[in-house]
Amino acid sequence: RIRQPEVTRQRILDAAVVEFSSRGLGGARIDAIARRARTNKRMIYHYFGNKDDLFLAALESTYEHMRRMEGDLRLEHIEPLAAMRKLVRFTFNYFLDNQHFVALLNSENLHQAAHIKRSRRVKPINYPLIETLDRLLCRGEAAGQFHSGIDALQLYISIAGVCYFYFSNIHTLS
């Protein structure tokens, strides 16, 4: 049998995203993740240490995926107002198409961001988007499309918040 550590690790991560998003941190079971990943618990502990670290890795991987997809938008090559519209549309559609991301965020929020606070990867993952947004705002301000003094981070929090709210509360709003 050929060992493929990166393939096994990714299968575990993919299985963890599904389990954690459907059952939450407390409800997800390592046995179920191992079954879904077609591996054993020992491999999960080998690659990720413990359940909390696996949850953090799942969260980080979903952030990385979203940021990679945002990078593919190439917003810096688009007129500022059109780029902003594209980002808002993308964010809404990303949450629509990736409900597991919303579910993982809900679970992490229940734990008061205890895992994300330990992450050394999430902030650096987010910086490029905020920097791109800041450049868009500057270009848009110079073109008379945006007001001056808009904070890129606060704007993104607003965009993500509006899009996230709908999906995180869809069951109680209907």
Enumerate the predicted regions with their spans.
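Hydrophobic/aromatic-rich alpha-helical bundle segments in the mid-to-C-terminal region
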Residues: H100-L104, K117-S119, K123, R139-S174
